[in-house]
């Protein structure tokens, strides 16, 4: 094995030719050319939790500093879906599965028009994906969308801290970031009502106009796959902004109302709760995730923050 090649290439038994040219590596194995683009422009960076715990890794994507809630996700697959899920808006996500990016990217499985995570924290970032549908490197996707990512870090150690102490604030910063400014970051209040940052801005329709059922979707941060599933079940959809009025929903005359998933604290959605109350007895209502909690509050229930957040 050519000594300039490592990581994924160590899987191969022998090399016919190995060379390095500029910022690209090329390896000829058994008549096939495998290429990768070096993770150029990377630098050391830190995740600092509010309890003072520090984890060192390497930065890729955007190099801007991040202050956010740090949560973990234990999924073995679906890293692209997590990154683009509006439910993670305003949060930095720690992926516990050790290898991320191994099947590349595929636009058809994204859950929103763009990434919503404020930061992404992974163990090993694969730059040699294996997937016949792959459309590009995950590292390039992070760069393209300006998402700060910390890799080469022990994500399971981070998760143990969060498991023992609960979800907490954290900052992602470059190694050259001024120490005095880190304290200023921790003093910042995290944004509230993330729903209004991710909801659609206008009413719209999608699906087969001749479908048997018509469903009004209250978009608190709805995932694309939920919309696709409703369409596949024979529904045409009218998607409303999170702050839509009940009279506008009823004017569309849907067969039922769907309250979607979304990010943040449901107690910030008093405006949505009041409108849902006005739908009682008029249309069937179904809620999922955030929508479920909005519906519970409309019926007089209360909600509280869980220790671990998303898992």
PLM segments and residue spans:
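Short hydrophobic targeting helices and cationic amphipathic motifs
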Residues: 5, 10-13, 35
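Ala/Thr-enriched low-complexity intrinsically disordered regions
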Residues: 15, 21-23
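Cysteine-nucleophile active-site neighborhood
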Residues: 256, 261-311
């Amino acid at each position: 094995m050519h000594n300039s090649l490592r990581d994924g290439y160590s899987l191969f038994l022998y090399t016919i030719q190995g060379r390095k040219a500029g910022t690209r590596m090329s390896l000829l194995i058994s008549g096939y050319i495998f290429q990768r683009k070096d993770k150029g422009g990377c630098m050391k960076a830190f995740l600092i939790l509010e309890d003072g715990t520090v984890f060192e890794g390497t930065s890729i994507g955007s190099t801007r500093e991040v202050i956010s809630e740090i949560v973990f996700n234990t999924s073995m697959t679906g890293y692209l879906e997590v990154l683009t899920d509006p439910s993670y808006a305003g949060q930095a996500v720690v992926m516990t599965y050790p290898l991320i990016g191994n099947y590349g990217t595929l636009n058809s499985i994204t859950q929103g028009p763009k990434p919503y995570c404020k930061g992404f924290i992974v163990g090993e970032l694969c730059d040699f994906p294996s997937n016949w549908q792959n459309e590009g490197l995950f590292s390039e996707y992070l760069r393209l969308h300006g998402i700060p990512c910390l890799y080469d870090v022990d994500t399971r150690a981070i998760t143990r801290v969060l498991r023992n102490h609960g979800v907490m604030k954290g900052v992602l910063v470059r190694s050259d970031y001024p120490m005095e400014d880190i304290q200023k970051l921790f003093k910042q209040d995290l944004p509230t009502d993330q729903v209004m940052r991710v909801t659609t801005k206008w009413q719209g329709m999608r699906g087969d106009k001749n479908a048997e059922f018509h469903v009004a979707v209250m978009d608190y941060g709805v995932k694309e796959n939920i919309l696709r599933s409703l369409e596949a079940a024979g529904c045409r959809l009218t998607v409303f902004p999170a702050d839509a009025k009940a009279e506008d929903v009823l004017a569309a005359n849907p067969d039922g109302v769907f309250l979607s998933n979304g990010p943040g604290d449901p107690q910030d959605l008093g405006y949505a709760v009041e409108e849902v109350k006005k739908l009682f007895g008029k249309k069937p209502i179904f809620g999922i995730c955030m929508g479920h909690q909005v519906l519970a509050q409309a019926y007089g229930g209360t909600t509280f923050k869980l220790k671990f957040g998303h898992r």
